[in-house]
A protein has these predicted regions:
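Positively charged, small/polar-rich N-terminal and surface patches that mediate targeting and assembly
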Residues: 1-141
Length: 141
């Protein structure tokens, strides 16, 4: 069984809407990465210029996650340091940022205060993977 893990910071006290938005960003980050780098080609069509994008998805990922239930597990980290522990574990497992996991930063235009030049780190989203793999991190939250 494939599933996707997302871990969000609890200490930010995000409103339900803000939390939903940040978790949504984390959930689609792996697909957006593929779409962005998927070989854009601008073509003229009846409705104007269009992008045609080709992406490659792992067969097991497609059949066991996308074509099925798209199982997601959302957990909470106590604070930024607790969230960064997930990054450390991921790196120890040989996983790479922007390939296996994505750090999600809020631009701080509404309710959060900026923590650094990138904004505020709100959550981490992992690409969907086999449950026994992602549980190596998920079970700690």
């Amino acid at each position: 069984m494939f599933k996707q893990l997302i871990i969000a910071r609890r200490d930010l006290n995000m409103s339900p809407g803000k939390l939903a938005a940040q978790v949504s960003h984390a959930s689609i980050a792996f697909l957006l990465e593929k779409l962005y780098w998927g070989g854009k080609e601008i073509v003229e069509e009846r409705d104007g210029l269009m992008y045609h994008i080709g992406i490659s998805l792992d067969r097991d990922l497609f059949h066991n996650w996308i074509a099925e239930a798209e199982t997601k597990v959302v957990c909470r980290a106590k604070n930024k340091n607790d969230l960064l522990k997930a990054v450390k574990i991921a790196e120890e497992l040989g996983w790479e940022e922007n390939k296996d996991y994505w750090l999600i930063y809020d631009a701080c235009r509404t309710e959060l205060e900026r923590e650094g030049p990138e904004g505020t780190l709100t959550c981490i989203g992992f690409r969907p993977m086999e449950a026994e793999e992602i549980d190596k991190i998920g079970k700690k939250y």
